[in-house]
Amino acid sequence: NQEYVQATVHLQHAEKFTVAGEYVLPMRAVFYDKDGNKHNIAGGEVLIPINVVDIAFANAAATPSGTMIPGSNYQLSLSTPLQYGTIENLTDGDTEQYGYLPHGTSTLTIDLNQTTTVKGIRIGMYILTGFEYYTDKVRVYGSTDGAKWLPLSEDIRLHETTWNNINATKSVNVRYLKLEFSVSDSYGSLSEIEVFK
């Protein structure tokens, strides 16, 4: 007779988690009776996984500083094919040449060909009245070897505008970037990817 319960945990001393990584907190499930007495639940030991992220990218109003890397200097690969358009549209400099990501989660991997100090990313979306299919959010990961990935952001909400700016909040040195897009509608517009160093 087991049940699953979804809960939110607020840590009293979150500042103790200073190193990014995965932690497991052992906890005990308890309940309080109508008189306010605390009771341990038999077999109520709970292990709560916590993933601590060192935030390095955040949504910004300003275009990333630095120099835009030409699209011909890096390679893109998608975990799922675009529903419309081609992957080449994402680096052609034209926001009116676009593609649609499918519903759900899609991952775009960017190989910069060498370790690079990344100052920001711009994500272009095609805005078309009557066909309001937009990508909801993105999460950024980075890697130096393409095998071990570190989360570099929380979910970043994308605005329904032609350009969304994601700026580095600290020094980021990676060869690979992975953008994990979430689409809640049938499709999510994606027209351009620009990387700044």
What kind of feature is each model-predicted range?
Residues 2-10, 162:
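Aromatic sugar-binding surface patches on proteins
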Residues 4, 20-24, 172-174:
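Extracellular Ig-like/FN3 beta-sandwich strand-entry sites
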Residues 12-20:
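Short, surface-exposed loop/turn segments at beta-strand-coil junctions that are enriched for proline
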Residues 34-45:
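Beta-sandwich strand segments
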Residues 48-54, 195-197:
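Interdomain boundary/hinge segments at the C-termini of tandem beta-sandwich modules
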Residues 51-113, 126-133:
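Disordered, acidic Ser/Thr/Pro-rich linker "stalks" and the adjacent N-terminal cap
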Residues 103-105, 130-197:
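Trp- and acidic/polar-enriched beta-sheet ligand-binding modules for extracellular glycan
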Residues 116-130, 179:
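A short beta-strand element within beta-rich, extracytoplasmic domains
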